[in-house]
Amino acid sequence: KGKGFFMPKFYFTSESVTSGHPDKVCDLIADSILDEALRQDPTSHMAVEATIKDDLILVYGEAGTNAVIDYEKIALQVMKEIGYDEEYHVLVKVNKQSSEINGAVAHDEISAGDQGIMFGYADDETEELMPYAIITAHKLAKKLEEVRRQTPFLRPDGKTQVTAEYVDGKLTRVDTIVVSTQHTADVTQEEIRKCIKEQVIDPVIDPSLVDENTKYLINPSGSFVLGGSWGDSDTTGRKIVVD
């Protein structure tokens, strides 16, 4: 009573993923296709998706564009830039956009032919005006990406998660930090945990927000050699909330 809207104490958790997470791989393939379409034809309307499993990449959808796009080349280039050196096969099923749909979205004053419901807010607890947990999870994922590209035993797939503790509506401490990273088979979990704690977590987390009770969970499930599309099947749009 007297505390207003806020619960006396609660925890808020957010996650992020690296570019090598297979969901984000699919997003990046679709984004790169859209970028190429808009580069050639600024009036392009693209509804192209990607799905990946093991060595198969499926690119499919509808395209309303005058651009000439090499879908296979773009998909394979994305995989290479992310850091996956396995051999992939690309199956493309992209048709010309329906004239009925194209006619409904082709007017200059209309920028979209569908609808959605979104919500969001600015939060002054960080410089980015985002809640602490999500912005810190993103920073950890970005740092993990940087360290991975300089560390031979780290591989592209990864996920981060931050749980923040609030008391009377105010951020008080970080309760839990989770970092899961794919790696090669020739490294111990102790080496991985030391690397991630010193090179990823410590440079990102404000030391004033951690204490002796803060939990650091680095590869909590143990070995993470099989990752990317070989460990999961994924598709575009699954990380919209994370984004």
Regions of interest found by a model, annotated:
Residues H21, L38, G237-D243:
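Electropositive polyanion-binding surfaces
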Residues E62-I69, S223-I240:
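Short glycine/threonine-rich loop-to-helix capping motif typified by GTGT followed
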Residues A47-T65:
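Short, charge-patterned binding micro-sites
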Residues T13-V17, K73, Q77-K80, Y84-S229:
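Glycine-rich, mobile lid/loop segments that gate access to catalytic sites or pores
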